[in-house]
Structures are given as structure tokens and as C-alpha cells.
Design a protein with these regions (language model features):
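Short solvent-exposed coil/turn linkers within tandem alpha-helical repeat scaffolds
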Residues: 66-73, 101-111, 129-132, 143-160, ...
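Alpha-helical linker/edge segments of TPR/alpha-solenoid repeat scaffolds
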Residues: 86-91, 119-131, 164-179, 215-229
């Protein structure tokens, strides 16, 4: 079983491309670390690989609490965040990932960590009639990842989600405009449709926004139209 766990950890390190975590892996095979810390790491990985994420969090948290300066601790920090993500405890996962980035800003796992923060927000995107905060936050996070690490594979993965974020945001903006129009709040509606047109021209709402802009302008005086423009 321990061999299976070690293989799982090796796969994790290979996928992350993280030198610091690889050093952790090297340390795990050495003699300088506490057997108890090592056992917590192995048991935590065993639980994680088996999908027992709550148990994994418990083991890794014990490792952090009892051996905060252990070379295992960095692995525990990351797997706590990953476990929360798999449990869909997105708020806790975001906090853990952000703490990792803050504590280890030069760690090579940071692109993965930023990507996971974006995924936490992205996975909460609902229908266009719901709060668009997750879409906005996912978009901003993936944009930050692309800017900071333009050549990283996680930046490329994040960029693939940007269109979905934008479509959710613009769909909500358009729907609010339609609501205002039907409520005869034409100036407010016009403002929404103008925003769709100017800020999001290429995501499928261009023609529909133009049609509503014409209908709103027909209901407004020149002075009212000028206020919006």
C-alpha cells in the first residue's frame, strides 16, 4: 500500500512540474524526517487517492500542526486545498490556495495554484439569471494567470475558460437590459445594451443588443439618449 501511495505522490510531483515539491519527495525518502510526519503524509495521500478527502484533510492538517517545519508541510498545504476543491468547499479551497501562493510566491506550483483558484470560481458559475460574481472572479483570475505565466500550461488551460466566463457575464447584462426594457425603464435598458455592444462585441449578443438599442432610442427623447451616450 505504501508503494502505491509513493507512486501517487510521484505522479503528483511530475504533473505539477514543481521543483520544490520534488525536493519534498526526495526528503520523504531520506532519514532526517520524523517517521510520524512521514506516516501522516503517506496516510493522507492514501486517503486522498481513495477519494476520502475529509480524512485526507484531517491527516494533512495534523501534519501541518505537529510538524510545521517539516519538508512534508508544503505538500500538506497543497493537498488540503485540493481536497477542499474536490469536496466543492470552494471558499475553503480558495483560502487555502491563496495562503499557499502568499507563503510560497516563487514556488513552481504557483501557476497550478492560481489556476485552481480560477476553477473554484469557474465551477460556481450558474445560469445567466444568477449572481455573476463567480464569472467575474474566474475571468480576473485566469487573466492574471495568463499575464503572470503566459507560457505555462495552466495559463493555456485557463484561457480556454475565458469565453465561458464572458458569455455568462454578457448574458446576464443582456437579460437585465431586457428586464428594464419590459419594465419601461428605457434609459437604464439602453445603458445595459450599450455596455453589451461596447464591452462584449463578439460573444453572440451583438445583433440582439443593436435591435434593443433601436427600440430603446425610439422611446427616449434626444436629451435622454444623450445622457446615456
Amino acid at each position: 500500500m505504501k508503494r502505491v501511495i509513493v507512486i501517487g505522490i510521484f505522479i503528483l510531483l511530475a504533473c505539477s512540474g514543481c521543483n520544490a515539491l520534488k525536493k519534498t519527495w526526495n526528503a520523504m525518502t531520506g532519514k532526517d524526517l520524523s517517521g510520524t510526519a512521514q506516516q501522516l503524509a503517506w496516510t493522507g495521500m492514501d486517503a486522498y487517492e481513495d477519494g476520502e478527502y475529509k480524512d485526507a484533510i484531517d491527516y494533512f492538517q495534523q501534519l501541518k500542526d505537529w510538524y510545521p517545519f517539516s519538508k512534508y508541510a508544503i505538500l500538506a498545504e497543497l493537498k488540503i486545498a485540493d481536497s477542499h476543491y474536490h469536496l466543492k468547499d470552494y471558499e475553503e479551497a480558495i483560502f487555502a490556495y491563496e495562503e499557499f501562493e502568499k507563503l510560497h510566491p516563487r514556488n513552481e506550483a504557483v501557476p497550478y495554484v492560481i489556476y485552481q483558484i480560477g476553477r473554484c470560481y469557474f465551477d460556481q458559475i450558474g445560469t445567466i439569471d444568477r449572481d455573476q460574481m463567480p464569472a467575474h472572479m474566474a475571468y480576473e483570475t485566469f487573466q492574471r494567470l495568463e499575464k503572470q505565466f503566459p507560457n505555462d500550461k495552466y495559463a493555456r488551460s485557463g484561457s480556454e475558460h475565458l469565453t465561458t466566463c464572458v458569455r455568462s457575464i454578457v448574458g446576464s447584462e443582456y437579460n437585465v437590459g431586457v428586464f428594464y426594457f419590459k419594465s419601461k425603464h428605457y434609459k437604464a435598458a439602453l445603458h445595459r445594451f450599450m455596455t453589451v455592444l461596447s464591452d462584449y462585441p463578439d460573444v453572440g449578443y451583438h445583433q440582439k443588443a443593436l435591435e434593443y438599442i433601436a427600440r430603446c432610442e425610439a422611446e427616449l427623447s434626444p436629451e435622454e439618449r444623450a445622457e446615456v451616450n
